[in-house]
Amino acid sequence: MKRISDLVAGGGAEQCLQQFINQSTWEWEVVRRDLAHRLVEPLQPQALIVKEVVFPKNGDHSVGVARQFAQSVGRMLNCQLGIVVFLAGPAGSCPVNWRLLLPPAWDSDHGRRTRAHLPDHEHHGPKWQQVVEVVEETVRDWRLPAIPIVVDMRHDGDVSALAQALEVHGLNYVLRVSANRPAVTVRPTQAAPRTLSFADVISGSTRSNALIRWHLASQRPGGGQLIATRLPNEPLSSGHESRFRPAPARPRPHSQQRRSTTRHVAAEWPSTRRGARTTWLTTLDASALHQLPDYISLHDRISADLEAMYDLSGLRHFEGRSFSGWHHHVTLVSVAHAWQYLDPVTVRVGPVV
């Protein structure tokens, strides 16, 4: 904050900037929406990439802070957790929408809610639901192109719930999943039902004709190929009748009926390894599956972009405690990151300190 004050106002404006972030009432949603629309032309986005963001904290008064497991770093720590939506395309990427993930303890802690100015309607919810809400706002409410949604769900047990919810909203997705997670339940006519993992589906398809293969670009470490197969959900035409149904998901409201959607399972198989490097679940149809390597590359690139943002755009440098302050801070981070795409003159800056 002091560095911005010195550079922009010649010093002495730090307190005003703090107030602008923590106490002002400007609407962050409007700024994000307008920023996203301005970025569509320069970025030519091909996908919306959803990532987890982690804000390590020392105390326990900042909004949403708790000792909790951060999937993206693989450990427990005292932190705030959020999710961010990137517009991503060949020309670059930029974060355009954000959600703060509230831990369950914050629902009933009226003292901390009051001190953090947390709105009454903000509560803990499953991650998959938060993803659906922020994506729905970004695409439907802001009227952005309905491009595929790419999310890493390896460490989340609600893959099926997220997939079904996105299908209800008519949104295509590319979800990274754990190969050992349940994918479908096979129900032979004269045997007990058996649940197959995503790895089982891929393994079974390598011995059939229902498989699509691409050789991966040379820039992918290990080379190899990407293989994809349709996730069965109807009787197979084989020697015995079997019915494949999606693995069980959490209950959804009775008003939400999932439309019939073809799903594909894909695995990235390097030539130097015996097993798959990554496994994916997608609603891309057969004619669009050739674009899957591009979405995987975009997802990998965003991970590197996010790490750079922590330093270059000052993402982790929020010192306030309020709900609105957090949203103002991350919105300004989006604006700072977008400057390289919106300004015709490229400006190189050092890390924010």
Residue ranges and their predicted role:
Residues 1-19:
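Gly/serine-rich nucleotide phosphate-binding loop at the start of the catalytic core
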Residues 15-19, 73-145, 274-278:
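Electropositive, glycine- and tryptophan-enriched low-complexity nucleic-acid-binding patches
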Residues 54, 288-320:
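Short amphipathic alpha-helical "interface-anchor" segments enriched in bulky aromatics
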Residues 25-104:
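Active-site-proximal, Lys/Arg-enriched surface segment
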Residues 93-94, 104-106, 120, 174-178, ...:
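An anionic, glycine-rich sequence signature occurring as long contiguous blocks
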Residues 115-188:
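Domain-level cores of phosphate- or acyl-group-handling catalytic modules
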Residues 315-353:
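Basic, amphipathic alpha-helical segments enriched in Lys/Arg and hydrophobic/aromatic residues
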Residues 4, 47-56, 85, 148-156, ...:
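Short, conserved catalytic/metal-binding motifs centered on acidic residues
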